[in-house]
């Protein structure tokens, strides 16, 4: 009898073991295995282990190599910024559209919506699936001169711009600044050594990438979120069944509070006197400028690249108007 029970128990364990087959993940973190993104992914791996998903994390400090290895089949999934994962899912890749989510409350509402089962169909595109979305903080403009505090003041300034970020290049051209082609591994060095006048990054870069050096002695950080940046976990859509994929997204959403606490500590680490405050009257104008640019980059008109998903832009517009119904955009004829 004991032998029968033991055999039966082992037979029941086999499917569970098979379901926990490892899923290798190329993880981009500019700091490497000791960085905040990699640590968040380690916590996420613990969360999904109970689902029978055993993540094997491989750290990469070069995002292009991480995505390249994923494309080459060296990893089953990749965790990278949405600027790089946009080709795998244009819908979620549009979260970082310029000026589309002016507050963290707006971002929270969006991510809560995307974690629901009814959004599952939007998480798949052409053989790939989004398994998790993790905020890395709002993107701010770091400047070497505090007088660079308006869109007009950017004219002629040298801006470190990611070569593959077509929307940023369009915006830099729009404000008549000068694009200095860069990537995530070298933009900080260019800003810190004075090769460029401005750089665009989340608050973590102030200390982690030593951008505090680049703003000395007369610069600062413009206190306006140009975009909400995220790291997205993308896998081939045959790696997890629909139920596990949905639970994986819910696990990522369940970590939102933890991740936002980390972002809050990173923003708090920037001394108050280093922030450059923008008058509310100016912000209204900037929001309309960004909206016009989003429409151009949705439709691919006026020389703009077509990089934004209309469905995501509409969803984010609905979220903005729910939180600020009096905004002019909410009754505009060309509302997103």
Locations of regions flagged by a protein language model:
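General N-terminal leader/first-domain-start detector
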Residues: 21-86, 320
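Pocket-flanking alpha-helical
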Residues: 58-97, 142-144, 199, 203-215
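Boundary at the C-terminal end of the N-terminal hydrophobic targeting segment
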Residues: 16-20
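Bacterial N-terminal signal peptides
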Residues: 7-15
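Bilobed "Venus flytrap"/periplasmic-binding protein-like clamshell domains
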Residues: 21-51, 129-193
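Positively charged n-region of N-terminal signal peptides that target proteins for export
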Residues: 1-4
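Contiguous mixed-secondary-structure segments that line small-molecule binding/active-site clefts
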Residues: 81-175, 211, 225-335
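Glycine- and acidic-residue-rich phosphate-binding/metal-coordinating active-site segment common to enzymes
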Residues: 178, 182-214, 222-229
